[in-house]
Amino acid sequence: TWATHVDMETGRPVENPDLNYLEKEQWILPGPLGAHNWQAMSVDTAAGVVYLPAQDNPLIYGMSEEWKASGVYKRNEGGWNLGIEIAGIAQLLLNNLEDQPTPKGYLKAFDPLTGIDKWVVEIPHYWNGGVLGTAGGLVFQGDALGYLTAYNKDNGEALWQFNTYTSILAPPVSFMIDGIQYVSILTGNGGGDLFAGEPLPPVAEPASLTYGNYGKLLTFKIGGDAALEAPTAVDRSIPEQPALTAS
């Protein structure tokens, strides 16, 4: 990671000198998506933990060609002013794929007072859904692979799982009608990541890329028996180019 620790006197992170990218591009964790993004978390005040969707999503950082040539940073009107190479970042990625840290996602039971994880569940894709914690001791989360999972809040054990066949970003919600408790989830992916194409191995392919990004509202209750038919995978093969007949 780009910082070795946090200086508890100043509250500032202490930069890792081994990952300085002034002279040579470096893989940095976390990348610009952060170790946690906007996906909802859930707070358990009784247990003193936060159930947190987290991610390791690295990005290659290098200085712009202009800075390398002149040593001077100039502000760019009407564009991003990050001081790093943006236009050529795709080539930087291709040049450094062998050294890329593996992107991963996590569901963490995190103690915000100690900074210690009580438990961690690893997820094969980094861009997953928000979290719902219940008074019954369950933690629900949907993931990029399309699974809605209920975990034991004490140890992270998966107790129940349902394949929605669509990537999930939204958090589940719970409500009660006539004494019956329900859990609902809105499936569907969004953001630029969905349109970036197939992820590079070993990152798992998101369900919305495999089956199409068809959002659904699904509702569950104990004893519910409705089934969801498995869709056909989308054919994304490149068709054969037709013969050129122009002269």
Describe each PLM feature range:
Residues 1-33, 42-49, 55-122, 176-247:
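Extracellular/periplasmic ectodomains of large secreted or surface enzymes and adhesion receptors
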Residues 34-40, 169-171:
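Short alpha-helical segments and helix-capping/turn motifs at coil-helix boundaries
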Residues 158:
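Catalytic-domain carbohydrate-binding cleft regions of carbohydrate-active enzymes
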Residues 42, 132-133, 173:
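Conserved beta-strand position repeated across blades of beta-propeller domains
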Residues 139-142:
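Aromatic-lined ligand-binding clefts that engage carbohydrates, nucleic acids, or primary amines
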Residues 124-128, 165-169:
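Short coil/turn segments at the loop-to-beta-strand junctions that recur within blades
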